[in-house]
């Protein structure tokens, strides 16, 4: 059954992607009045308890204006120089506009490896999570000063989708000059219809976005559908809407034209399915009965409950968790590498800093990174043993 669309303030954590054209005028630079209105919308969402993250384009466009670079395509080094200048301008603009609502902005610049390599992924996620806990609004962009043509996201639609899945967001909003997905290019086909709800991204839906070399894809719809596949598969709903109104989020709430893409499942369920089913464990942790009970009640795995560490693994690698019966009961992402795990196994969390020399995480495997893979109580094994007994009677 397709999930129903909700009001924006009914979501828990929302990632908003903002296109360059919304923020920057090629001749005059930053569109401050639009940015101020956008920040007012963000403040209104936060006042209702919604956590908000922003993926903001515009650094290269702003830097280009400040440096007075000529029109047309930029060389890689020119683009990187423009990004270096523009990132400062962009971060300051967001900080100043959000501060009028007593909101602190935090800048995060990501490269492709920060979401594709698990250790860096965990570090980036931890930083973003801490910013959210401190009440800050993370302003995220690709680090175009070091990204190359070969190693980069290439567009902020897909970057925003990666961020949304990383932080477990339940809604991704893509704001640009496109107000939704149409059955055909509306400027070419007067009969084109806006799809207000997309239950699933099928091959037919992908075809509506155009191929890689189509005119429509150059307008950005293809990358938005790619972003939708990333987000919805991970349990995150997505909205494509126009950012042209001065209060774009308020316009969406008021029923403005947009397309809503239904999520495949909850963020936690989809992510834990990925952990359990697609990754081979690099090692294992054997735990006691008390720790097993804690895990089955939804708690994190603390060092005190770990009795043995097996294998050679790094922080962020997938590991198996072996219960008191000797069977695998769960899988998760390691909060420590194998060497550190061996040092703190069986110890209290308060002792970690003394043993390792730094204040590490309290959990060996955090509950958000853990999925149970065996039923409780050992019922399946017990029934199997009974069956064997009857067979030999």
UniProtKB/Swiss-Prot annotation:
Substrate binds at residues 57, 144, 156. One of its GO terms (cellular component) is cytosol. Keywords: Amino-acid biosynthesis, ATP-binding, Cytoplasm, Kinase, Nucleotide-binding, Proline biosynthesis, Transferase. Pathway: Amino-acid biosynthesis; L-proline biosynthesis; L-glutamate 5-semialdehyde from L-glutamate: step 1/2. It catalyses: L-glutamate + ATP = L-glutamyl 5-phosphate + ADP. GO terms for molecular function: ATP binding; glutamate 5-kinase activity; RNA binding. Transmembrane segments: none annotated. ATP binds at residues 17, 176-177. SMART domains: PUA. GO terms for biological process: L-proline biosynthetic process. Its EC number is 2.7.2.11. It is found in: Cytoplasm. Its main location: cytoplasm. Pfam families: AA_kinase, PUA. Residues 282-359 form the PUA domain. InterPro entries: AceGlu_kinase-like_sf (IPR036393), Asp/Glu/Uridylate_kinase (IPR001048), G5K_ProB (IPR041739), Glu/AcGlu_kinase (IPR001057), Glu_5kinase (IPR011529), Glu_5kinase/COase_Synthase (IPR005715), Glutamate_5-kinase_CS (IPR019797), PUA (IPR002478). Gene3D superfamilies: Acetylglutamate kinase-like, PUA domain. Catalyzes the transfer of a phosphate group to glutamate to form L-glutamate 5-phosphate. Belongs to the glutamate 5-kinase family. NCBIfam families: proB. This is Glutamate 5-kinase.
């Amino acid at each position: 059954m397709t999930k129903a669309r909700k009001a924006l303030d009914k979501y828990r954590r929302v990632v908003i992607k903002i296109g360059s054209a919304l923020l920057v005028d090629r001749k005059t630079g930053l569109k401050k009045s639009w940015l101020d209105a956008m920040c007012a919308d963000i403040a209104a969402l936060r006042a209702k308890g919604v956590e908000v993250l922003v993926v903001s384009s515009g650094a290269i466009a702003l830097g280009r204006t400040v440096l007075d670079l000529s029109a047309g395509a930029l060389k890689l080094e020119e683009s990187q120089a423009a990004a270096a200048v523009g990132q400062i301008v962009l971060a300051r603009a967001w900080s100043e506009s959000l501060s009028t609502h007593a909101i602190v902005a935090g800048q995060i610049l990501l490269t492709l490896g920060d979401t594709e390599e698990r250790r860096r992924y965990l570090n980036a996620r931890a930083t973003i999570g801490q910013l959210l806990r401190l009440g800050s609004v993370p302003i995220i962009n690709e680090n175009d000063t070091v990204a190359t043509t070969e190693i980069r996201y290439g567009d902020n639609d897909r970057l925003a989708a990666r961020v949304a899945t990383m932080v477990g967001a339940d809604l991704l909003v893509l704001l640009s000059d496109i107000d939704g997905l149409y059955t055909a290019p509306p400027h070419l086909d007067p009969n084109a219809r806006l799809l207000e709800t997309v239950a699933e991204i099928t091959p037919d839906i992908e075809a509506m976005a155009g191929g890689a070399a189509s005119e429509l894809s150059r307008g950005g719809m293809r990358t938005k559908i790619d972003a939708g596949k990333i987000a919805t598969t991970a349990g995150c709903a997505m909205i494509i809407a126009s950012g042209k109104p001065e209060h774009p989020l308020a316009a969406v709430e008021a029923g403005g034209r947009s397309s809503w893409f239904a999520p495949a499942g909850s963020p936690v369920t989809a992510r834990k399915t990925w952990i359990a089913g697609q990754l081979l464990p690099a090692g294992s942790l054997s735990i006691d009965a008390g720790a097993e009970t804690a895990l089955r009640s939804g708690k994190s795995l603390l060092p005190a409950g770990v009795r043995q560490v097996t294998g050679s693994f790094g922080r962020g690698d997938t590991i198996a968790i072996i219960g008191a019966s000797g069977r695998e009961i769960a899988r998760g992402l390691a909060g420590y590498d194998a060497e550190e795990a061996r040092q703190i196994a069986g110890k209290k969390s308060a002792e970690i800093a003394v043993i390792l020399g730094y204040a590490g995480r309290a959990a060996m495997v955090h509950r958000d990174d853990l999925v149970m893979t065996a039923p409780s109580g050992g019922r399946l094994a017990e029934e199997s043993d009974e069956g064997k007994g009857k067979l030999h009677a």
